């Protein structure tokens, strides 16, 4: 996402070398969104102000900010907490706000770091639904997480990384059949039925056409890195 300079290799997005681009440039020009594991809301601002602040940074005018803010509040079902201080929200409410704020710039790719950390099981299902809806809109999603059981339900392809090396990659079923992955990460999971994944709690409105992403990520793919 641009926070750490790679030791080697290059990062391409839509055939553009973005290896040396800082995070803000990747977001504004490259269409890349990033959600860190740590809570990133502006605690002293309201839910609504958190969204508006990002829109101002992007240079949106007042009318654009109002329309986009109302749209995101409704899409993520956080209208009822629009004036609540972000620091007082529950873990799940903060996570929905963070994802909504990440979408302000209409990214083509979203990178999620441990999106299920610190939230209750019901909210986990809600976030799974949100991720599924984003994928269906044509947004590529790259997830780094240790919550294998939750993540394997929603990823199209998974990469398991151990000691800096790719241990294996494939579909959920291919991952759970890998002996070394089972031993190190999955324990007694015998199979994995993605059809059992929770249905989305709500749908996100499609804005314009679907987008495509480069750097090896297919359109509408959700990837997982179990490091």
Across the structure, where does each feature detected by a protein language model lie?
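ABC ATPase NBD coupling module
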Residues: 5, 17-33, 38, 62-66, ...
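Conserved ABC ATPase signature
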Residues: 85-89, 93
């Amino acid at each position: 996402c641009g926070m750490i300079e790679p030791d080697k290799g290059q990062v391409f997005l839509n055939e553009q070398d973005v290896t040396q681009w800082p995070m803000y440039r990747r977001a504004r020009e490259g269409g890349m969104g990033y959600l860190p594991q740590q809570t990133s809301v502006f605690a002293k601002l309201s839910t609504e102000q958190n969204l508006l602040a990002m829109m101002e940074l992007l240079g949106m005018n007042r009318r654009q900010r109002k329309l986009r803010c109302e749209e995101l509040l409704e899409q993520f079902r956080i209208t009822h907490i629009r004036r609540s201080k972000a620091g007082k929200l529950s873990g799940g409410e903060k996570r929905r706000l963070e994802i909504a704020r990440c979408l302000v710039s209409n990214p083509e790719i979203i990178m999620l770091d441990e999106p299920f950390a610190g939230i209750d099981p019901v909210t986990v299902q809600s976030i799974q639904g949100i991720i599924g809806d984003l994928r269906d809109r044509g947004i590529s999603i790259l997830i780094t997480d240790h919550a294998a059981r939750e993540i394997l339900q929603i990823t199209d392809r998974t990469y398991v990384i151990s000691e800096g090396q790719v241990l294996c990659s494939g579909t959920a079923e291919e991952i759970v059949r890998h002996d070394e992955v089972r031993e190190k990460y999955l324990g007694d999971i015998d199979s994995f039925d993605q059809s059992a994944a929770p249905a989305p709690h709500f749908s996100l409105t499609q804005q314009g056409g679907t987008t495509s992403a480069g750097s090896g990520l297919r359109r509408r793919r959700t990837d997982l890195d179990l490091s």
